[in-house]
Amino acid sequence: MSGGEKEMPTNKERSPRYNRILLKLSGEALAGEEGFGIDPKVLDAISLEIGQLVGIGVQVGLVVGGGNLFRGAALQSAGLDRVAGDHMGMLATVMNGLALRDALERSNIRTRLMSAIPMSGVVEHYDHRNANRHLKNGEVVIFCAGTGNPFFTTDSAACLRGIEISADVVLKATKVDGVYNDDPVKNPDAVKYDALTYDEVLEKKLGVMDLTAICLCRDHSMPLRVFDMNKKGALLNLMLGGKEGTLVEAAQ
């Protein structure tokens, strides 16, 4: 289904390691230091990073979360229906997608925004055939509204979209530089993993992604890499053969 990881050194031609990627951005990442809302500086920084990838010929699909605009947990504990809460979360991802598309297009990067929920006149409805055509034409494609169904996380949506568009890898951007055996923020002695198998992630309960997302990647042999998006140039370095974060893939 997927092309898999290719280990290749950086070369003078700056040939990318991957032809097509699915990048998962959390909603919190868009909030920057504010912790809520959308930080224009973050949008500009993300646009710059993605523009560099497009410039070397990488086809980029994006899935964005919505946690910077809506968190359903507190309301659900107060009695909000889970399905209603999940639908509100999906709408938050659409707002983030609109902001991302605007930022990318202001940087002269041709971008499509596709929603799993039909929103005529606002965004294009998701169709994997059209998404593949857009990617082949060199356009960045942002996928929003999750899977379109409640009870599924945006991490699961990212893995699903990555599989559907035959991405070479799913890249999860986080606030830390990979996967650790404990929370590195709380435990300074936490040990980072350079590589893991899907089964090790599940057995060790490392919390890289939810169970559904990890199982999707495992069952379809989709490599997953967790890296620090806040590290300037990390994404481009990954594309050019550098080692960033933690790679999760099938056992060799």
From Swiss-Prot:
Q: Which organism is it from?
A: Alcanivorax borkumensis (strain ATCC 700651 / DSM 11573 / NCIMB 13689 / SK2)
Question: What Gene3D superfamilies does its record include?
Answer: Acetylglutamate kinase-like
What are the binding positions for UMP in this chain?
G66, D86, T147, G148, N149, P150, F151, F152, T153, T154
How does this chain assemble? Homohexamer.
What pathway does the annotation place this protein in?
Answer: Pyrimidine metabolism; CTP biosynthesis via de novo pathway; UDP from UMP (UMPK route): step 1/1
Question: Where is ATP annotated to bind?
Answer: K24, L25, S26, G27, G67, R71, T174, Y180, D183
Its recorded reaction(s) are: UMP + ATP = UDP + ADP
Record-given protein name? Uridylate kinase
> What molecular functions are annotated in GO for this chain?
ATP binding; UMP kinase activity
Q: Which GO terms describe its biological process?
A: 'de novo' CTP biosynthetic process; UDP biosynthetic process
**Keywords from the named record:** Allosteric enzyme, ATP-binding, Cytoplasm, Kinase, Nucleotide-binding, Pyrimidine biosynthesis, Transferase
Q: What is its EC number?
A: 2.7.4.22
Give disulfide pairs as residue numbers.
none
* Chain spans, region Involved in allosteric activation by GTP: 32-37
Q: Which PANTHER family match?
A: URIDYLATE KINASE (PTHR42833), URIDYLATE KINASE PUMPKIN, CHLOROPLASTIC (PTHR42833:SF4)
Tell me if RNA-binding is a UniProt keyword of this record.
no
Q: What does this protein do?
A: Catalyzes the reversible phosphorylation of UMP to UDP.
Protein family (similarity comment): Belongs to the UMP kinase family.
- Asked if the record carries the keyword Cytoplasm, the reply is yes
